[in-house]
Amino acid sequence: MWLSGRGLRCVRGGREVFDGLGFEAAGGEALALVGHNGAGKTSLLRLIAGLLAPAAGTITFDGGEPDTPVAEQAHYLGHRDALKPSLSVTENLAFWREFLGGEPTDLPAAIEAVGLAHAAELPAAYLSAGQRRRLSIARLLVVRRPIWLLDEPTSALDVRGQEAFGRLMSDHLAGGGLIIAATHSPLGIAAREMRIGAAA
């Protein structure tokens, strides 16, 4: 499995974010996007996820046709946790599993993996910032997709939460998955760096 981008150009709000950008990443590999604020790290993740259309260039998954959608093979974890405050931890994950079209999976196992078993029936509105981030991370586990696109994934996590997420990422890579992450902090896993934009 591999994912590549060629000649990518991104324009947002009439401003060119980047042009001529390319990348390649293979299954079992983590790619860390680094660069100053506004360099285009989040924009690249959103292009790959299909949330933005490139002004030029192509993104290809697994050697297929350039127009093959990557979105159906990828999870995108953005800055916002995208939770429904009135729904419980379990209900939020059930919603996302149905929305993403996943096969039935073990929701309690996903909740346990992120350390929220004690809060499984608690509404998301009552969770701390770190707990909300862990619940958001649990979405990666309820529907199996080979590509994880992560935007500052460890924000709001304490040291213990970062270590637990590092183990989840390591397991994903060991199973042949691929991770592309925009981050200002160490991911806690071995990752190849790709700098976007001029050095800060």
From Swiss-Prot:
This is Cytochrome c biogenesis ATP-binding export protein CcmA. It comes from Rhodopseudomonas palustris (strain BisB5). The keyword Transport applies. Part of the ABC transporter complex CcmAB involved in the biogenesis of c-type cytochromes; once thought to export heme, this seems not to be the case, but its exact role is uncertain. Responsible for energy coupling to the transport system. The gene is ccmA. Keywords: ATP-binding, Cell inner membrane, Cell membrane, Cytochrome c-type biogenesis, Membrane, Nucleotide-binding, Translocase, Transport. InterPro entries: AAA+_ATPase (IPR003593), ABC_transporter-like_ATP-bd (IPR003439), ABC_transporter-like_CS (IPR017871), ABC_transptr_haem_export_CcmA (IPR005895), P-loop_NTPase (IPR027417). It catalyses: heme b(in) + ATP + H2O = heme b(out) + ADP + phosphate + H(+). It is found in: Cell inner membrane. Its EC number is 7.6.2.5. It comes from the Bacteria. The lineage of its organism: Bacteria, Pseudomonadati, Pseudomonadota, Alphaproteobacteria, Hyphomicrobiales. It is a peripheral membrane protein. ATP binds at residues 35-42.
